[in-house]
Amino acid sequence: ILTTTYWGSQGILYMHNCKGEELWSRELRCNGAVITPVNWDGSGQDLVLLSASTEHGGLMDGEGDIVVPFPDDGHPELCCEVLDITGDEREEIVVWDLKSLWVYTQDRAKSKSDKTYLPIKYPHYNASNYRGEFCFPRWIES
């Protein structure tokens, strides 16, 4: 369970196990974090989108480490969202501001398997800027 709070500072993250015991905490340097689960590579190991910031954002693993940073390529950093745009069950990161919209996707082909990782997530029709996210593991026959 990953939560964010603004008590004392903006964007403090807490990771808890299923019993509510704190595993770790991090204080981010960015103003807020979307903490959205991401099925980035289809492996069943979900990552968490923090923000589109090249300095403080990226995709974080369950240990709190940034494992997929955003490149310093001039992309917008104002807003970001997680969507499966290409239809291969892996999710893309959409980043935008008032002038442009960019899409980041994986640089590798989807691996062939008898099962496909397709987690149960928050429905897009309920999307809001103030929402709680969930992600329950689910494997389906390919």
Where are the regions that the model predicts?
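Beta-propeller-forming repeat regions
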Residues: 1-142
